[in-house]
Amino acid sequence: ATSATPAPVESPAVPETSTTSEAIAPAEAPSAPAESPKSEEKDTVILHTNDVHGRIVEEKGVIGDAKLATVIEQERAKTNQTTLVVDAGDAFQGLPISNSSKGEARAKILNEMDYDAMAVGNHEFDFGLDEAKKYKEILKFPLLSSNTYVDGARLFQASTIVDKNKDVEGDEFVVIGVTTPETATKTHPKNVKGVTFTEPIEEVNKVVEEVQAKAKAEGKDYKHYVVLAHLGVDTTTPVAWRGSTLAEALSKNPLLKGKRVTVI
């Protein structure tokens, strides 16, 4: 999360990757009859961007969306891996080329790159609450935040199931979004009037319970969890609201024992 004024441009966001060897266990064979399709042994590669702040055009130190799209296309073309493409927030507000359309032009660019999911960052509210809601309509993939509420109801979808191979059971990914409660002070207060940001750890654990209860009722068992956390890392950020604290808390969640979780 960054300040409420136009976002800094000191560090370009580039796609980062993580593989099963470090982050996520390979999918286990489903306990189904022998004739059911089984997942192949593949690495999982997560390409993630965050805090791009409207950097659509390539310049020194900035990859730009054209080259970003090429990287995504090249990774998805690799048949020996499963590729997820996600964004951890603050994608739209920042540079004039994006601000001129209130970020809507860049939202459409992300659609062209076919992202799998995105978390809500504090700067997604910089053009007002109505515009933040509008992003949900423009984007063709889920915009996630499990801890953003209006009138006691979640404003955004809390989680999504990403299934890269619908013919294979057991290789789905549960993606959960969470937004920094600092949003209340890191965008203009008028932009989040009536919006409540609840505790990240409590809310993510609640979503895990919700997802697993629904999965059990449907006879499913999701083994991979990815948390897109737009949380602060500064010393001024309360410890309970930091991404590192969330990662530590999830590692102790008994519901996730024997599973793998990646916090981005």
Name every feature range the model reports, one short phrase each.
Residues 34-264:
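Acidic, metal/ion-coordinating pockets
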